[in-house]
């Protein structure tokens, strides 16, 4: 569960967080873990190049063909400026995202799991989703990922079925205000 003294914030990636991004990436690679909601972070050992690539997804004129607009957020623990999670919001869905990725992808640093960070991120990104005009939010997880399944349900998710590779599909009827 999230400890009360762990104040968190969602911020967009910037040079200020290059060292934390590199350490976050290393934590996942050392654990041979999936890096959901991180965009192409796995492919980049140069954080400046990662940031430049991530920014391409924020504007129609630089968006790679076949991709969707997306906003990347870092979840920073204020007490030590540590990157504990990442969450990506896709502004709309293409065919692939309708059955596998959804509007939101997220991950929590392996060494920081089971502290409520995923639930906090999912709850606190919903006002941003609402500002994009999303009336429903699709969030997916593998059927073997019990932690994500519970996180999604805790945040108003409703089971909508199973798609490819045992991906469970959940929708929230509307983004909730978090005030």
Regions found by a protein language model. Give the residues of each.
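Conserved acetyl-CoA-binding loop-helix of GNAT-fold acetyltransferases
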Residues: 106, 114-127, 150, 154
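Conserved GNAT acetyl-CoA-binding A-motif
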Residues: 131-140
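A short, internal acetyl-CoA/4′-phosphopantetheine-binding micro-motif in the GNAT/acyltransferase core
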Residues: 76, 90, 103-114
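Conserved active-site alpha-helix within GNAT-family acetyltransferase domains
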Residues: 144-159
């Amino acid at each position: 569960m999230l400890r009360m003294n762990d104040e968190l914030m969602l911020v967009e990636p910037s040079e200020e967080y290059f060292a934390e991004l590199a350490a976050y990436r290393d934590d996942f690679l050392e654990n041979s873990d999936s890096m959901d909601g991180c965009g192409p972070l796995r492919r980049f050992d140069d954080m400046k190049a990662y940031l430049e690539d991530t920014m391409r997804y924020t504007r129609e004129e630089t968006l790679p063909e076949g991709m969707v607009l997306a906003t990347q957020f870092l979840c920073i623990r204020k007490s030590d400026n540590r990157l504990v999670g990442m969450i990506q919001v896709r502004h709309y869905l293409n065919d692939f995202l309708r059955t596998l990725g959804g509007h939101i992808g997220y991950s929590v640093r392996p060494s920081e799991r089971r502290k409520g960070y995923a639930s906090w991120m999912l709850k606190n990104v919903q006002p941003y989703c609402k500002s994009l005009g999303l009336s429903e939010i699709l969030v997916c997880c593998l059927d073997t990922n019990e932690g994500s399944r519970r996180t999604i349900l805790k945040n108003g998710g409703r089971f909508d079925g199973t798609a490819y590779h045992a991906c469970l599909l959940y929708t929230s009827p509307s983004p909730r205000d978090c005030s």
